[in-house]
């Protein structure tokens, strides 16, 4: 997605060979025009998959998920990372390790919002090692929901997340695939045109 690549090149900050900071438009300050376009792109990619719900994880996945939900006209459910006074019973849960925060947390979704009749699209802002994605897939599996695929805003292709999800049999659609962050420079995966 060209607009997203431009944003990454112009506003993203490479902090290390592993970390790209995109808080100017994606996961702190949010560019609503970009989010709208991201939602439209995910809707286009998954429009024939019978999506009934989108699931994501709080908080950075919510904006692109809501825009995709709007475009597909389906509800969005987000997994909570923090304990909630109102979310205590009938929970679908999974443990997720965050390499960015160096902490393991339990994510949770109420089983009243996800069930066996659902066909879900899982959306997240980043795909690196795939821990959040696998956690969301585990929650969908507990609900006996079908996973149509993963919509990823930015994929760090040099990390094992995509390969892990593909090996598990999942479809992965990433709007920007980063090959490298070496030497402080973002290098995108060159897509082969057929």
Swiss-Prot record:
Pathway: Purine metabolism; XMP biosynthesis via salvage pathway; XMP from xanthine: step 1/1. GO terms for cellular component: cytoplasm. It is found in: Cytoplasm. It comes from Bacillus pumilus (strain SAFR-032). Its EC number is 2.4.2.22. GO terms for molecular function: xanthine phosphoribosyltransferase activity. Belongs to the purine/pyrimidine phosphoribosyltransferase family. Xpt subfamily. Converts the preformed base xanthine, a product of nucleic acid breakdown, to xanthosine 5'-monophosphate (XMP), so it can be reused for RNA or DNA synthesis. Transmembrane segments: none annotated. 5-phospho-alpha-D-ribose 1-diphosphate binds at residues 128-132. It catalyses: XMP + diphosphate = xanthine + 5-phospho-alpha-D-ribose 1-diphosphate. GO terms for biological process: purine ribonucleoside salvage; xanthine metabolic process; XMP salvage. This is Xanthine phosphoribosyltransferase. Xanthine binds at residues 20, 27, 156.
